Amino acid sequence: MPSPEEDPQPLLKDQEETAYDSDGKVLSFGIDYDTESGGSTVVPSFSWRKLWLFTGPGFLMCIAFLDPGNLEGDLQAGAIAGYSLLWLLLWATAMGLLVQLLSARLGVATGRHLAELCREEYPTWARMILWIMAELALIGADIQEVIGSAIAIQILSNGVLPLWAGVIITASDCFIFLFLENYGVRKLEAAFGILIGIMAVTFAWMFADAKPSAPELFLGILIPKLSSKTIKQAVGVVGCIIMPHNVFLHSALVQSREIDHNKKGQVQEALRYYSIESTAALAISFMINLFVTTIFAKGFHGTELANSIGLVNAGQYLQDKYGGGFFPILYIWGIGLLAAGQSSTITGTYAGQFIMGGFLNLGLKKWLRALITRSCAIIPTIIVALVFDTSEDSLDVLNEWLNMLQSIQIPFALIPLLCLVSKEQIMGTFTVGPILKMVSWLVAALVMLINGYLLLDFFSNEVTGVVFTTVVCAFTGAYVTFIIYLISREVTISTWYCPT
């Protein structure tokens, strides 16, 4: 039996945790990079070949804009508000793009991702709170994503497979996809490209079948309109766009390309290509969300079913409304939902690896980190599936609680991100300028206020009793105090790793 020193696959690594090992990165600057002209400051002209080499991280990032939670928000917004909130979907996606571009900027400029920087930036007690909050957000999102995928499996199996069986299948095949990374990150990115393509095709097919009103659709996109009856759906559209774990994830994904951070030209060029591919990815995600919203706006807006439709019964409602056709719309919906649930579950596990590795620096092998993070989420998800398998109303209530959990966590990803990208000793010459900084904080404040409204509305309806109210008030006080601490605290991070 070999000794631990001879073990070719040790569970622990000797070196510090990194998002990607050097031999696993994609070579983006090589054969056609002119070191003399590209040097440290000159940015080479645009190249389609290089854009292709940098394409990938943005499409993994955009999955969080297409997860089952977002799809449920889309269908409810369409059924209740019709086409009237499409303009808000557009601007919410634009706000999400700004946040994700800042996350990518942080990762490219520093060579480290957000969780790693938080480990260096904050004292142990604050760092542990941030880590716990990130993990809770991830578990909440994962439950929604796995349940969404399990619902799709139940639809496609004609109800033969119960919800808990779909949960186990989803959890298992997640590792199969992550195994692709062993053959190169581009293989994993290609798999995600296929899943996004499946979503685009299925929901576009349904969009064509529904035949929505083109004038109403364009008016919904171009003319802002909001009524008192649709405020809750409007808040939901904005609130589910920014996912805490996605902010951590994108700052790590951009490090999958080999970049010399000592060459300003390379960093600038990388940021340019990442900005283009992220914008393209979120444009596609916007179209998919638009398809889902308009399908349900056309079919259910103004009907008695509008207020009762949800992710669990949406497929059957679609089947009853639009009938069978060449290929039953129920199964088209199931395929699209499965692609959304499966892809978002994988990115959730991927994000969990970076969050745990960055905050704790345990030095674990990737497969072991994936096993730990998957287990943390799958156990509560199986319990949820067993308890709520036959109750649509209970699943809707659970989904409201999980949305509330996501809303609580948003400041603990946004505030550290905005503080870090604003500090010259961390970002060097890539520090955000005063105008971008102001706009970013305004967007962050708007998102946090909107989610604060969600929390206030939720707790005003759900919190009853003296004991429960006291606990919630105490938690709220501690919550607000910690947010103030994050905003006001001076950066004390070491500068030994900062770009030059």
Swiss-Prot record:
Statement: the UniProt record of this protein carries the keyword Transmembrane helix: yes
Transmembrane portions of the chain: 51-71, 79-99, 128-148, 160-180, 188-208, 234-254, 280-300, 322-342, 370-390, 401-421, 439-459, 467-487
GO molecular function: cadmium ion transmembrane transporter activity; manganese ion transmembrane transporter activity; metal ion transmembrane transporter activity
Tissue and organ expression note: Expressed in roots, stems, buds and leaves.
Highest taxon of source: Eukaryota
Lipid bilayer topology: Multi-pass membrane protein
Keywords associated with the record: Golgi apparatus, Ion transport, Membrane, Transmembrane, Transmembrane helix, Transport
Record's subcellular location: Golgi apparatus, trans-Golgi network membrane
One GO cellular component term noted in the UniProt record for this chain: trans-Golgi network membrane
One example of a Gene Ontology biological process annotation: manganese ion transport
Catalysed reactions, semicolon-separated: Mn(2+)(in) = Mn(2+)(out); Fe(2+)(in) = Fe(2+)(out)
First and last residue of the signal peptide: none
Entries under Pfam families matching the protein: Nramp
Disulfide topology: none
Function statement: Divalent metal transporter. Can transport manganese (Mn) and iron (Fe). Involved in the control of cell-to-cell transport of manganese (Mn) between organs and tissues to monitor Mn homeostasis.
Protein family (similarity comment): Belongs to the NRAMP (TC 2.A.55) family.
Database matches in NCBIfam families: nramp, Nramp_1
HAMAP family: NRAMP
Protein known as: Metal transporter Nramp3.1
Gene: NRAMP3.1
